[in-house]
Amino acid sequence: MTETVTTTSSDKSEKKNYLFYTSPNHRPPTVVRAEGVYLYLEDGTRIMDATGGAAVACLGHGNKEVIDAMHKQSEKVCYIHSMGFSNEPADKLANLLVSEHPDVFARAYFANSGSEAVETCLKLILQYWQLVGEKQRCHIIARKQGYHGNTLFALSVGGMKPRKQPYEGVFSHTTSHVSPCFEYRYKENGETTEEYVARLAKELEDEILRVGPEKVAAFVAETVSGACTGCATPVPGYFKAMRKVCDKYGVIFYLDEVMSGIGRTGTMHAWEQEGVTPDIQSIAKCLGGGYQPISGALVGHRIMNVFEQKDAAMAGFFTYQAHPIACSAALAVQTILRRDHLVERAAEMGKYLSEKLHETFDSHPNVGNIRGRGLFWGLEIVKDKATKECFPPEYKVGSLANKIGCEHGVFVYPGMGTIDGTRGDHVLLAPPYIITREQIDELVEALSKTITSTVAALP
């Protein structure tokens, strides 16, 4: 929003924007309307939202059924404090999510962002160990190049170095990191998939033994990696091996599906394709589809049984947790996903997107790798395809691709730190599940122009 202000140092009036933008010295374009898979700017420019924002808008923009559900709820109850009351949309949403996997989950807890969902899961894990009399179990093992959110605890378990750097001095010292499952970058030449999995499993076990099994609370991983490694998918057997190591030492197995969950990879939960189940899981983005800020923790029986036996509440609340309007929006989104078979559609359209990406970019000299599942895809941009050499980090290739993409009519999610948290670049695609084949053709054509123009613009 702009307004005319009068400064104290001058009688002259000037227009000033007071919003703290992503870059304080650059005002991004303003979206004045959004419909389906498209965004419309002030000047009438139409841009395809090829990432659903930040892998959020699974239903696309402007779904009237969701908007009507929010309006209807706003006429009943807009806000109550969940410390003292419940509300109908929250109860219905929890019942829907948990009842689909009653053998896996016991309860659902709703917060406001992916970061809050991760914080909630981590806090519940630590409180669980206190309740069972093992309060020394407070060490979290995560993965390098993981990204779990922007709050301090979530950042401390993550591996995106540029976002962590300003706060290094206050991070928890009870976190450590093992290698991610990142076949393109870290599977060795001549190494079989089974050998690669065994090596990663041994690394996790060695880290548990180094810390001390009696001190390790949980292992946390993104089922399909998101912002940092750009949709790096696990190789077959990886998560089964990780789960086996965790079970051996009694370590909580926590899967973060803030970005990859709720249908994004072609199944409701990404872990359904891995043959494992989590002890606890975080969800967010496609839970509410961007219509309201909402996230959740799906709590398994191992943890919930102890809370029930001890009659223990979670040690802390969020003011807006289980917000009635947010839950009504999410309930509408989840109802539509199931009724209209949109998760299955994400799998179907994902196959077509995969075909088009490989057809277009397999021979591109600056696309080193194409990876993903469902409607969740990453393209790693490299300087040399044969050697996998990346561009220097200071080139900010992902950000440049994002900017140039908008000039070609497509918004792509920029990625950096792909290789080690600092080096490496990718762009991420996560279009709405309602995208059509014709729109996928449009997306890939614009992306081809974007990547070619981006590389041409580099020093």
UniProtKB/Swiss-Prot annotation:
Its EC number is 2.6.-.-. Pfam families: Aminotran_3. CDD domains: OAT_like. Keywords: Aminotransferase, Cytoplasm, Pyridoxal phosphate, Transferase. It is an enzyme of class 2 (transferase). It is found in: Cytoplasm. The modification N6-(pyridoxal phosphate)lysine is found at K285. The keyword Phosphoprotein does not apply. InterPro entries: Aminotrans_3, PyrdxlP-dep_Trfase, PyrdxlP-dep_Trfase_major, PyrdxlP-dep_Trfase_small. GO terms for cellular component: cytosol. Disulfide bonds: none annotated. It comes from the Eukaryota. GO terms for molecular function: pyridoxal phosphate binding; transaminase activity. Belongs to the class-III pyridoxal-phosphate-dependent aminotransferase family. This is Uncharacterized aminotransferase C1771.03c. It comes from Schizosaccharomyces pombe (strain 972 / ATCC 24843) (Fission yeast). The lineage of its organism: Eukaryota, Fungi, Dikarya, Ascomycota, Taphrinomycotina.
